[in-house]
Amino acid sequence: MEQRVDIAHYHNVLSRKHQIIRLLWGIAWPMATWFLPRSMGMPWKRMWLRLFGARIAKTANVYASAKIYYPANLEMKEYSCLASDVDCYNVAPVIIGEQSTVSQGAYLCTASHDITDPLNHLITSPIVIEDQAWIGAKAFVGMGVTIGQGAVVGATASVYKNVESWTVVGGNPAKVIKKRVIN
């Protein structure tokens, strides 16, 4: 039997409403935030995120250059941060815990395609970043991953499996480097 991928018959499972909200968001966010310096305008940015359904704490920090696919699937708790140029591809929910930081250029990816399906159907699973965790610059966090409390994902690491609390991981694929100890 010949194996064959048939994306010509792929069907987008996202609703028309979802697509329209995405279109409006794609226009609104850059227009509402392009003129703001990085350190200013946080209440304004939070307001826009909330208008599009995000659950975001008063002290959460989102840089204007952060890309958020679907605000209604974003929850940010107290003192959490999405830094500059973060790409939050949140087709499924992304939850960022208190005092957690996602550093510049990191990629949070809640969706992929089923490579065993000839139609490559979309598959999704949430990402949870627990309290006091840190995602390093340009790191990749894949769908379905939970980053434990206090864990650190090193710069440019690629995480495909859950990371235990108070653990430092790095590399591709990410491997445990050591336990994180706060002095």
PLM features: what roles do these ranges have?
Residues 1-54, 58, 132, 172-183:
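Terminal amphipathic alpha-helical/low-complexity segments used for targeting or macromolecular assembly
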Residues 35-46, 64-77, 81-146, 172-173, ...:
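Flexible, glycine/small-residue-enriched loop-and-beta-strand segment within the central core
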Residues 57, 146, 164:
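Short conserved AdoMet
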Residues 137-161:
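Beta-rich strand-turn-strand
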Residues 165, 170-173:
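Acidic, glycine-centered active-site loop in nucleotide-sugar glycosyltransferases
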